[in-house]
Each structure stands twice: as structure tokens, then as C-alpha cells.
């Protein structure tokens, strides 16, 4: 009886392992994977590119206070559509994708994709009413990442300039680009793949900056400051955009 019981137990364990393996295989091609499966790349023929990253710029300051982590940082936004970051991203991504897919234009409102979660992204994607021939949307969106500049408990999202004050009036500054690329099924609105755009070793894209770059207020920025920040963001995006597309099997 004990031998029979052991056989049943082994069979149950084998069945459980089989279920787990099947679930893993199914999950590997489902939502929230970090790259397209071979089946996805064969099924997707036509895409549209949506970049909703470069309309606003965040100024985030963490003061030199003992309990600064208890409350939100001092944050201000600046409208930067005149920097033309999104059109540049869309042009670069479209050119890279055109080697593998047909790329079609799409009309969208950036505000619909500025603050998002996956359920909201599904609704916004289904509301696009794009060309029925489009199989998937490739979206470049603001992401929220842990603070790897000043190591506070706050998160950094989108494009911005971060400042953490230190004792003695010193400050640590960094320009960051926190974003991700998401592929959405145009018919169902479901997420096919999603991947954060990171530097090697999964690091937040950021560059150290001189404290003199911090303006009194966002609206007081000089042309030199605007040019420096725009150039820094372009450098970060150039370093991460195409490698992320390649890692997702969107581009060769």
C-alpha cells in the first residue's frame, strides 16, 4: 500500500510540474513579457508608433531635511513640446521598425498616454480608432523608476532634472530619462510586450549635471540651460532607444 501511495504521490507531483511548465510556456508569450515571441513577430505585419514621452519636463528637488522622505519631493513641470523630442523619437523608431514591419501613421492625443497603467493603456488604445490594417501599436511612454541618482525613496518619471540637496549648501544634480516601450495589440488592447529602456546592467539612464543648471523656476530657464537639458535628454534617449527595440525583437 505504501508503494502504491508513493506512485500516486509521484504522479501528482509530475502532473503539478506539467501544469507549472504549461503555465510558464503560455505566460512566456502573454502580457508583460519583455520581448516579442517568434509567434508575435510572425503575426504582426503592420504597426503604428506613438511617442508620448517628450511633452513635459520634470524638475524634482529633494531637500536636505531629516524626514524629507516622509512627504513628496518639490516637483514642477515644464511644457517642452517645442524641444520636438517626440517627433524625433517617432522618426527614429519608425525607421528602425520599417526593416521588419510596415509602419502606418496614427492620430492620437499625447495627454491620453501621459499618465497610464496597463488597464488605462488598453482603454486608450481601443479608443484610437486606427486603421484596421494596424496589428499593433508601439508606444514610447513615461515610466517610473527608483531614484538611482540621490537614492531617496521617491521615484523618477519621464524626462527631468533631479536635485538632492546636501549639508553645507551642496547639491547633487542629474538629468534622467525614465521611459519604457510597450507593444499593444491594436485589436484587443492587450499588452503584448513591455520593457523599460535602461542602460547596461539595468541602470536608470541619467547624466550628472552642474548645480548651475538648476533654474530659479522652470519658467526662468535661460536658452543656454534649455539647450543643455535638451542635448542631455537626446544623448540619453540615443543611448537606450534602439538597444531596447532590439532587445524586444522589434528591430534587427
Go through each PLM region and give its residues.
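Bacterial N-terminal signal peptides that target proteins for export
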Residues: 3-18
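C-terminal/domain-edge helix-coil "capping" segments
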Residues: 29-57, 167-252
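N-terminal post-signal-peptidase region of extra-cytosolic proteins
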Residues: 32-34, 77-79, 118-126, 157-168
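N-terminal segment of the mature soluble domain
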Residues: 58-150, 176-198
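A solvent-exposed, charged loop/short amphipathic helix patch at secondary-structure junctions
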Residues: 61-81, 158-167, 210-223
Amino acid at each position: 500500500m505504501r508503494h502504491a501511495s508513493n506512485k500516486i504521490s509521484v504522479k501528482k507531483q509530475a502532473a503539478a510540474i506539467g501544469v507549472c511548465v504549461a503555465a510558464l510556456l503560455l505566460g512566456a508569450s502573454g502580457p508583460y513579457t519583455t520581448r516579442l515571441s517568434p509567434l508575435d513577430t510572425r503575426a504582426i505585419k503592420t504597426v503604428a508608433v506613438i511617442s508620448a514621452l517628450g511633452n513635459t519636463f520634470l524638475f524634482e528637488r529633494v531637500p536636505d531635511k531629516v524626514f524629507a522622505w516622509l512627504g513628496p519631493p518639490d516637483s514642477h513641470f515644464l511644457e517642452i513640446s517645442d524641444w520636438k523630442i517626440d517627433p524625433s523619437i517617432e522618426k527614429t523608431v519608425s525607421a528602425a521598425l520599417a526593416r521588419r514591419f510596415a509602419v502606418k501613421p496614427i492620430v492620437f492625443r499625447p495627454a491620453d498616454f501621459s499618465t497610464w497603467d496597463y488597464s488605462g493603456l488598453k482603454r486608450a488604445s481601443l479608443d484610437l480608432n486606427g486603421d484596421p490594417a494596424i496589428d499593433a501599436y508601439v508606444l514610447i511612454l513615461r515610466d517610473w523608476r527608483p531614484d538611482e541618482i540621490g537614492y531617496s525613496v521617491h521615484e523618477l518619471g519621464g524626462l527631468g532634472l533631479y536635485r538632492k540637496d546636501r549639508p553645507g549648501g551642496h547639491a547633487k544634480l542629474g538629468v534622467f530619462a525614465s521611459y519604457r516601450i510597450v507593444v499593444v495589440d491594436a485589436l484587443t488592447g492587450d499588452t503584448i510586450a513591455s520593457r523599460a529602456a535602461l542602460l547596461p546592467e539595468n541602470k536608470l539612464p541619467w547624466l550628472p549635471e552642474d548645480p548651475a543648471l538648476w533654474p530659479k523656476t522652470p519658467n526662468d530657464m535661460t536658452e543656454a540651460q534649455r539647450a543643455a537639458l535638451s542635448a542631455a535628454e537626446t544623448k540619453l534617449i540615443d543611448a537606450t532607444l534602439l538597444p531596447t527595440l532590439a532587445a524586444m525583437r522589434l528591430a534587427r
